[in-house]
């Protein structure tokens, strides 16, 4: 039985300083995951959730690995995992998406995903994370990071 979904909103930067309101379908299982976290982790998760939906209206939410929120569009885009003192954002990019802002904090040698760990009181580099989400989605639409990586010389 598919979960009952609700509509949520996020805003998307249009590049000229303007913002566009984006409506997305929220999975209540993701709401439940976020809802039991401490307030500071809830705020981080909600901001990341809004960013990934702002990257592309077609991103869908689901739960994988029993209870972990995943955001998918023609493949995994990212996942959330709250830890004791931070929230991990797993970026499923195969290590091929550029990180000019240096937001990647772990998994540099991982063949599947890298991590952005966001700690309490830290400000999310929303522009950098949004750019990475957009590139991961573009890569997914082009056949996925595995195909793109294999095509490299």
Region locations from a protein language model:
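Charge-dense, helix-prone N-terminal extensions
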Residues: 2-153
